[in-house]
Regions:
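A mid-to-C-terminal "edge-of-domain" accessory segment
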Residues: 2-38, 295-476, 512-515
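Alpha/beta enzyme core
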Residues: 3-4, 8-10, 34, 50-69, ...
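Short, small-residue-enriched loops and turns at beta-alpha junctions
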Residues: 41, 45-46, 75-79, 133-135, ...
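Short beta-alpha connecting loops at secondary-structure transitions
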Residues: 136-139, 211-213, 269-277, 289-301, ...
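A conserved regulatory-domain signal marking ACT and ACT-like small-molecule sensing domains
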Residues: 454-460, 467-470, 476-530, 539-540
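Mixed-charge, glycine-accented linear interaction segment located at domain edges/termini
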Residues: 529-556
């Protein structure tokens, strides 16, 4: 590539002469009007276009999400699209508050077929388009500015004559100067204004002017400048519903749309998960959830994102990428040790404070708001630290290891992760935990009992039977509570040198078969004064810590 100079082949996009641009200081505080084009733009890009059952399934999904405008096809260009349009109308499958949209080019016979397909509908948008860009005028149409403008006006006039066959207000009109971003702004404005005049647009009956980034050609700020320039220069802005139709050729379709909304747009056409020609249309799911995470109601229902993914994948036969914003299966997953630690602490803080505001590091959205679970937030591999294995023990098994035990235990997990090079699942972590703490060592608890020495005395007497080297040995001692007494008995009988330095306990489940998990830390007086941890699990809150002491002693 170093020998190739791209400027000899490619021309950079020119800046827009927009003085005192306002969009950089604006914020998005309301959802736009959304129009799904999954059934047209999305469908035409598929290797195997959707059949009627799949189209119907997707249409019903879009309706249930809250879309009020849905482009259902190009009836005059495809028998399948025509039949689908008629099927929806004749079977009364279009809710009263939903407007269907159909696409047509500026040719009389196509317009005739389009209006024929709409007979009997309650509300529809007829979307007229023709390409007006400099390149297409030169290469495709071989016409000058006047010739291409007349294509739009001829189509607009012909459509106007069709409206008297429908009740007033049933048909709404939309015009797109296709390839808008490759068109001189003054010319795009000229064509749009004359179409608006032809259709007698006014504040009471506005026309949708849709400005497509048919091919994304520049950085997002350029598109925002173009939209603000157009918005500022319409002779009567009140008669225009300014719509966006961005594509994602440069990978910045979402950003371009957001900036263009800040620049004054009212409406967005896009698809679920960005399906569409080439690199796709703008992704309405990402756009909507970006708004949601800024405290803005997107007016679309994303609360069961997994079901939405399943439907989209079934209908399009295209997978949603694992790293797709919000939707991907790995989006809410952390493998990095530092990330896991921050997430775990953030989740603990949220739980303890009961605050409504969502503030968790590395998680811009609460997964539960989109129907995701917390199970996959943290997963463990060779890049993970102590927080990952500790989180999985806590979430899946209600085991809350003390911090020191977390560090020691994570080393065992890390060793396996390094040697295998694979993900360490929750079940594998539990298996490691059992081998570390719940194994049968040389000391085994056979029997245990405790009783208070007297009513007025806090001391207790414990009596236990320990299996040691296959021999049952009875032990007993008194102390301030059963744990202290048992530690004393073990030290005295087996000449063990250690001291109990910490103890904690939690319930693992509720009900008549509830289990308790106990954790002890003992200090061994070797040259490092090391800590050894033990864990005990039992339905008895008295026996669980006794088993934890045995576990720790077996691990010395």
């Amino acid at each position: 590539m170093s020998e190739f100079d791209p400027k000899n082949k490619y021309t950079p996009f020119e800046r827009i002469n927009l003085k005192d641009r306002k969009w950089p200081n604006q914020i998005i505080n309301n959802a736009p009007t959304w129009c799904s084009v999954d059934l047209r733009d999305g469908n035409q890009s598929l290797i195997e276009p959707m059949d009627t059952p799949k189209k119907l399934k997707l249409f019903k999904t879009l309706v249930s999400m809250g879309f009020k405008e849905i482009e259902i096809g190009f009836p005059a260009a495809s028998e399948t699209d025509y039949n689908f349009c008629r099927y929806l109308i004749e079977n009364k499958l279009i809710p009263n508050d939903v407007t269907i949209q159909v696409l047509t080019q500026a040719r009389e016979h196509l317009i005739d077929n389009t209006f024929e397909a709409l007979i009997g509908c309650n509300s529809a948008i007829v979307h007229l388009y023709n390409s007006v860009s400099t390149l297409q005028r030169k290469v495709v149409f071989k016409q000058d500015r006047i010739g291409v403008k007349n294509i739009a006006l001829d189509g607009a006039k012909y459509i106007l004559n069709k409206l008297d066959k429908f009740d007033e207000g049933v048909i709404k009109l939309q015009y797109s100067p296709e390839s808008f971003t490759g068109t001189e702004l003054d010319y795009a404005l000229e064509v749009c204004e004359e179409v608006l005049d032809c259709w007698k647009a006014n504040q009471k009956n506005p026309v949708i002017i849709n400005l497509p980034a048919t091919v994304e050609m520049s950085t997002p700020n350029i598109y925002a400048d173009q939209i603000e320039w157009m918005s500022n220069n319409f002779s009567n802005r009140d008669r225009v519903i300014l719509s966006l139709h961005p594509h994602n050729d440069r990978g910045t379709g979402v950003a371009a749309t957001e900036l263009a909304l800040m620049a004054g747009a009212d409406r967005v056409e896009g698809t679920l998960f960005g399906n569409g020609e080439r690199t796709g249309n703008v992704d309405i799911v990402t756009l909507g959830l970006n708004m949601f995470t800024q405290g803005v109601d997107p007016k679309l229902d994303f609360k069961d994102l997994n079901q939405l993914i399943e439907t989209a994948e079934f209908c399009t036969q295209l997978p949603v990428h694992q790293r797709h914003p919000y939707a991907g299966s790995l989006v809410h997953t952390a493998f990095s040790g530092s990330h896991q630690d921050a997430i775990r602490k953030g989740m603990e803080a949220i739980s303890k404070s009961n605050q409504e505001k969502w503030e968790v590091p590395y998680l811009p959205i609460d997964p539960s708001d989109i129907g995701k679970t917390y199970e996959a937030i943290i997963r463990v591999n060779s890049q993970s630290g102590k927080a990952g294995s500790a989180w999985l023990l806590e979430q899946d098994h209600n085991i809350f290891l003390p911090r020191g035990a977390q560090i020691q235990f994570s080393q065992s997990v890390q060793k396996l992760a390094d040697s295998s090079g694979k993900e360490i699942t929750s079940q594998i972590i539990w298996d490691i935990f059992e081998k570390e703490y719940l194994f049968e060592g040389k000391y085994k608890l056979i029997n245990f009992s405790s009783k208070k020495l007297s009513r007025n005395n806090s001391k207790e007497l414990v009596e236990a039977t320990i299996s040691y080297n296959n021999e049952n040995i009875d032990i007993s001692a008194s102390g301030n509570g059963p744990i202290s007494a048992f530690v004393t008995a073990m030290r005295e009988k087996f000449n063990l040198i250690f001291r109990l330095s910490d103890f904690s306990q939690n319930t693992r489940s509720s009900g008549s078969t509830a289990e308790a998990a106990a954790y002890v830390e003992i200090r061994v007086p070797d040259e490092n004064g090391r800590s050894v941890f033990g864990v005990g699990i039992d339905t008895s809150i008295t026996l669980a810590p006794i088993k934890a002491v045995i576990s720790a002693i077996n691990r010395i």
